[in-house]
């Protein structure tokens, strides 16, 4: 039997998706640049070791069933698979998923599969199937982030971990993440983020509480444009990360 990374297209009708067509087109148009370390996705490659170390420290992923929601070109999914996790990456940006699949084939990563499916649709099909769910840099790109949080909570097993990272809706975030990163430093393509879609930590915490995800750890992430270095901090005014754990008694 061939042990190749698996790709499934399980795409529901577009009108029912919790997705912004403009956002999907944006990331699909850049699909060929996902694995260019000096391209538009350079910031994701730079922060990936920090995200991975933090996740793996709180919940070692080796041997775990892991779901990466909004996986894009597979940067985080690939890294978790290399640590020994059984990883499923899902996204609705078709071209980005094809890039992720090709990279997995070239890297010969048999414990990594991809599906083109919404997180809500997968939650209806496979509730309680994963030990760990990651949803990184994705919530600020969807019309209904609370729906994504609920689906993530449904997909994880009781006692399992769900990790989120997103951007705070704050004046500092507007200046640094939009004006600075997109228009001054050109770290990201212009239009990557919309201020109105950013999410305050208090809002994300409320979404989590409503679906019995207990907040265990919060971290911020900062960037020095002179040294081009990212690091973790306690400052959540721009980029921040949540580590949550599903209540053992939760039934969604």
UniProtKB/Swiss-Prot annotation:
The keyword Transit peptide does not apply. The gene is ubiG. It is an enzyme of class 2 (transferase). This is Ubiquinone biosynthesis O-methyltransferase. GO terms for molecular function: 2-polyprenyl-6-hydroxyphenol methylase activity; 3-demethylubiquinol 3-O-methyltransferase activity; polyprenyldihydroxybenzoate methyltransferase activity. One of its GO terms (biological process) is methylation. S-adenosyl-L-methionine binds at residues 51, 70, 91, 136. It comes from Albidiferax ferrireducens (strain ATCC BAA-621 / DSM 15236 / T118) (Rhodoferax ferrireducens). Its EC number is 2.1.1.222, 2.1.1.64.
């Amino acid at each position: 039997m061939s042990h190749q990374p698996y790709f499934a297209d399980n795409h529901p009708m577009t009108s029912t998706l919790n997705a912004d067509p403009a956002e999907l087109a944006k990331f699909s148009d850049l699909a060929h640049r996902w694995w260019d370390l000096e391209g538009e996705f350079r910031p994701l490659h730079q922060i990936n070791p920090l995200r991975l170390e933090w996740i793996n420290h709180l919940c070692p992923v080796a041997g775990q069933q892991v779901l990466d929601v909004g996986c894009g070109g597979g940067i985080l999914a690939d890294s978790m698979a290399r640590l020994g996790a059984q990883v499923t990456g899902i996204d609705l940006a078709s071209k980005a998923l094809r890039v992720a699949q090709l990279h997995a084939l070239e890297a010969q990563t048999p414990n990594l599969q991809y599906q083109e499916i919404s997180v809500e649709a997968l939650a209806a099909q496979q509730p309680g199937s994963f030990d760990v769910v990651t949803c990184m840099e994705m919530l600020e790109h969807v019309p209904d982030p609370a729906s994504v949080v609920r689906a993530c909570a449904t997909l994880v097993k009781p006692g399992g971990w769900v990790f989120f990272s997103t951007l705070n809706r704050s004046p500092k975030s507007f200046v640094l993440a939009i004006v600075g990163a997109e228009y001054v430093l050109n770290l990201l393509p212009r239009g990557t983020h919309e201020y109105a879609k950013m999410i305050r930590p208090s809002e994300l915490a409320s979404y989590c509480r409503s679906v019995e995800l207990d907040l265990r750890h919060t971290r911020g992430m900062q960037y020095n444009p002179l040294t081009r270095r990212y690091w973790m901090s306690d400052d959540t005014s721009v980029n921040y990360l949540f580590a949550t754990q599903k209540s053992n008694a939760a039934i969604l």
